[in-house]
Each structure stands twice: as structure tokens, then as C-alpha cells.
Amino acid sequence: MHLVSVIQRGVWAVLLWPNLLASSVPLDCREEQGILSRCPSISQEKLLDRVIEHAELIYRVSEESCSLYEDMFIPLQFQRNQVGYACITKTLPVPSSKNEIQQISDKWLLHSVLMLVQSWIEPLVYLQTSLDRYNAAPEMLLNKTKWVSEKLISLEQGVVVLIKKMLDEGMLTINHSEQGLLQNGVQPQMLESVMRDYTLLSCFKKDAHKMEAFLKLLKCRQTDRYNCS
């Protein structure tokens, strides 16, 4: 029965995947020369809408990737226990409680999104490399993680331009680090690698949801500041 469920989910994913790609609005802010010059020509309101749409799609695909990974590699008894691995963004100064989120400024909402986005760029590259070593990783999972990784860079570019438009500020940079993912270049054992990759997928899904929620709150504040929750 479990195998049938996995196959059915895979069939639906194959059928819906092209539609998901076709429905996304491009958020490519970068010209060939590496200069952010496309998004600045978009109005602030439209740019925020596109950034939100990107965040929504990234969260949706991260959810699908995590579920697919669970079905393929993680026994039920381990799905709520990630073997003590902490999320890599745990130490970031990002609001977590509802009260904190409601009290922070628009500026800090945007910078929180950017910190989360930038903190995940390199770990997702690592995740792709790790999944490539699996003998049984389905192509759909590999394609989804690659798509999310690419869209995350587009989201970063959009948020950077949004910060400049809304706050008249330059880019906030985060020092990307893979420390704790591959320490001293030593490859983890397969079981450890599977659980570590599962933690990465689960943590990214949570952070992708935060990015989406922060951006939607920001959008709400632009129209009805006193009735946003």
C-alpha cells in the first residue's frame, strides 16, 4: 500500500511539474554582465508581488521534495526525529514567535528574508551533490532540489532590489559556510548522510515558509498596516 502511495505521488508530480514551471513569473534581475538592471524598472508593488510568488513556489516545491524524500528514504519512526541535527539557521537573528514578528520593522522583515535566503544558497548546492551520490534517488527529487536552488538565487536578487527600492539601502551579505555539512572534507556514512540530508530538507522547508510569511506580512503592511496578523 505504501509503495502504491509513493508511485501515485510520483505520477502526479510528473504531471504537475511542467505546469508549475510554466506558471511561475520570471524574477531574473541579473543581466549577463552581472549587474542588477532588470528588476529596478519594475514598480515596487509588482516586484513585491513577484518576490512573494517566488517564495510561495519555493516553499511548495520544498514541501513536495521533503515528502518525496520521506517516502523514499525515511522510515516513519524517524520522520519526527532528526537525530539531534540542528537547523543551520538556528543562530540567525531572525524573529520566531508571532509576537516578535508583529513587532519588528519592515526593514528587519526584509533583512530577515535576505539572511534566510543567503544562508541556504550553499547548503542547497551541497544537498544536490549529496543526493547525486545516492543509488536510488529519483530524478524528480533531483530536479526539484536543483530548481529550488536556482530559484533561491533569483529570490535573493529580487529581495536585494526590493531592499534598495523600499529602504534605499545596499545589499546585506552573509558569509556562506558549509561547516558542519562536510567537516574536514570527510564524507559521512550513508545512513548518517541520509538523516543529515533529511534534516537539511526539513529545515529548509520551515525556513522557506518563514520567508513566504514575512513577505506576505510586508505586503499586508503596505495596504492595511493595523490589521495584519
From Swiss-Prot:
This protein's record includes keyword Glycoprotein: yes
Q: Where found? A: Secreted
* Covalent S-S links between cysteines: C29-C39, C87-C203, C220-C228
Signal peptide range: 1-24
Entries under Gene3D superfamilies matching the protein: 1.20.1250.10
Primary site of residence:
secreted
Keywords (alphabetical) are:
Disulfide bond, Glycoprotein, Hormone, Secreted, Signal
InterPro entries, per database record: 4_helix_cytokine-like_core, Somatotropin/Prolactin, Somatotropin_CS
Q: Which GO terms describe its molecular function?
A: growth hormone activity; growth hormone receptor binding
Q: Which residues are glycosylated?
A: N143, N175
Asked if the Swiss-Prot or TrEMBL record annotates the protein with the keyword Disulfide bond, the reply is yes
| GO BP of this protein | animal organ development; growth hormone receptor signaling pathway; positive regulation of growth; positive regulation of receptor signaling pathway via JAK-STAT; response to nutrient levels
Domain of life of the organism encoding this protein: Eukaryota
The record's Gene Ontology cellular component field reads: extracellular space
Which family does the entry's similarity section mention?
A: Belongs to the somatotropin/prolactin family.
Record-given protein name: Somatolactin
Give the organism the record lists. Cyclopterus lumpus
